[in-house]
């Protein structure tokens, strides 16, 4: 590598080539996070419920976490979303329109003992799921 007084441009060019060996730079420069993301970089997305599924919790816990399988409206991708709250799955039926957001696990991954689930249901038919679980609002009839 040149080290002279006029070597700045050559050093900069070399560094720009070298950056492509850094996986973090590659993912950022090529926009791979947004491409791989089912929500397409958005904080929330709407989807249609395909089915209700029970996901077994990881060891040492023993439970069946109530989740729903959803097809996103914007791109047709299918994701699994967790239904937070006691009895929340009762407010969700097949073919309902739900709003999902990321579940908040580290590095965009799943959270806690729910394997492979990266999203959670926030609203059903444009009514907050939290409000329905607490009893403050009722689910609208479509």
Curated annotation (Swiss-Prot):
GO terms for biological process: translation. It comes from Methanothrix thermoacetophila (strain DSM 6194 / JCM 14653 / NBRC 101360 / PT) (Methanosaeta thermophila). It comes from the Archaea. One of its GO terms (cellular component) is small ribosomal subunit. Belongs to the universal ribosomal protein uS12 family. This is Small ribosomal subunit protein uS12. Part of the 30S ribosomal subunit. HAMAP family: Ribosomal_uS12_A. The gene is rps12. Keywords: Ribonucleoprotein, Ribosomal protein, RNA-binding, rRNA-binding. With S4 and S5 plays an important role in translational accuracy. Located at the interface of the 30S and 50S subunits. One of its GO terms (molecular function) is structural constituent of ribosome.
């Amino acid at each position: 590598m040149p080290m002279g007084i006029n070597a700045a441009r050559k050093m900069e060019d070399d560094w720009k080539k070298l950056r492509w060996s850094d996986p973090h730079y590659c993912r950022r420069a090529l926009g791979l996070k947004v491409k791989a993301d089912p929500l397409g970089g958005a904080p929330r997305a709407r989807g249609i419920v395909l089915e209700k599924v029970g996901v077994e919790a990881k060891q040492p816990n023993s439970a069946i976490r109530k989740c729903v399988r959803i097809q996103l409206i914007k791109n047709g991708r299918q994701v699994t979303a967790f239904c937070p709250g006691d009895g929340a799955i009762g407010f969700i039926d097949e073919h309902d329109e739900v709003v999902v957001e990321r579940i908040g696990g580290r590095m965009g991954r799943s959270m806690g003992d729910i394997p492979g689930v990266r999203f959670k249901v926030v609203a059903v038919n444009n009514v907050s799921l939290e409000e329905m679980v607490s009893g403050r609002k009722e689910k609208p009839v479509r």
